[in-house]
Amino acid sequence: MIIYLHGFDSNSPGNHEKVLQLQFIDPDVRLVSYSTRHPKHDMQHLLKEVDKMLQLNVDERPLICGVGLGGYWAERIGFLCDIRQVVFNPNLFPYENMEGKIDRPEEYADIDTKCVTNFREKNRDRCLVILSRHDEALDSQRSAQALHPYYEIVWDEEQTHKFKNISPHLQRIKAFKTLG
């Protein structure tokens, strides 16, 4: 089972395309939708939904995957639910760059302070990070600096922020999922 979390643009047709691409790894891909506008509510909702899926799950090696803001959530929810994560161009600093787009961007900073101390250290090697060198929305070098001490970084030379085509990375993701 692969759980897919969309980014800020929840209505993008690219979400469906990514789900179809992920089905080459596992036919059981589940899209979990969330508001993107209310961080504390989103965290509660995502934890509840992912936990429910895991309770009914028969896959011994489930995976959670997210793009952009979905990557922010996939890393945290995956850690809290003890499943491996794959994140594409994760938005690591939404409290800085979501101003004017959501109601309370400061809630992300609050979530960061309330999350498990040094959670990335405790999550070491359980998240695969795929970053685009051509991310027009986020500073991928800053993301790499924050995540490299804990996770493997894979660089993509073609894609932009929304990562329309993940197929060149499917074999790597499949191998990572198999490690479970």
Curated annotation (Swiss-Prot):
Q: Which Gene3D superfamilies match?
A: alpha/beta hydrolase
Under the heading InterPro entries, the entry gives:
AB_hydrolase_fold (IPR029058), UPF0227 (IPR022987), UPF0227/Esterase_YqiA (IPR008886)
Q: What Pfam families would the database entry show?
A: UPF0227 (PF05728)
What family does the entry list?
A: Belongs to the UPF0227 family.
Looking up HAMAP family in the UniProt record yields:
UPF0227
Q: What is this protein called?
A: UPF0227 protein YcfP
Q: Which species is this UniProt entry from?
A: Salmonella gallinarum (strain 287/91 / NCTC 13346)
